[in-house]
């Protein structure tokens, strides 16, 4: 909520935050944050906050990934994984490893362009020095 109330990104326009684990509770409270911005006469979140805040996909079940992609713009989502991570076991409900987060993203109905954004393009944009290094190596 401090991102909404303050002007951090006006003062530091190149500052970027990547909130791990799908943003935690952020997608669940998105309406609250939008309402707070409106109540405080702040610009919409996409203008005031989302140019600098990103979320990773390190979420351990399909409904969580689905919510993240329903709420957060595709340009603000980066692939993230802890594989082999904190929850290494096999989910008895699915038969797959809990921490195989790529399969949850793969299960989404994404265009090739959006899939590229999540797995590579957004990271290159968020980390321009990495992008320059990779381009320098022909990647």
Which residues fall in each region the model found?
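Mid-to-C-terminal alpha-helical segments outside catalytic/metal-binding sites
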Residues: 55, 66-67, 71-78, 84-139
């Amino acid at each position: 909520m401090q991102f909404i109330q303050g002007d951090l990104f006006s003062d530091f326009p190149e500052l970027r935050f990547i909130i791990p684990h799908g943003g935690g509770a952020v997608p669940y409270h998105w309406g609250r944050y939008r309402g707070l911005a409106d109540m405080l006469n702040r610009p919409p979140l996409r203008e005031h906050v989302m140019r600098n805040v990103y979320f990773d996909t390190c979420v351990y079940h399909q409904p969580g990934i689905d919510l993240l992609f329903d709420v957060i713009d595709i340009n603000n989502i980066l692939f993230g994984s802890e594989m082999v991570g904190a929850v290494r076991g096999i989910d008895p409900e699915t038969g797959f490893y809990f921490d195989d987060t790529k399969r949850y993203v793969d299960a989404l109905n994404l265009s090739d362009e959006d899939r590229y954004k999540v797995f590579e393009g957004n990271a290159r944009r968020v980390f321009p020095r990495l992008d320059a290094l990779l381009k320098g190596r022909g990647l």
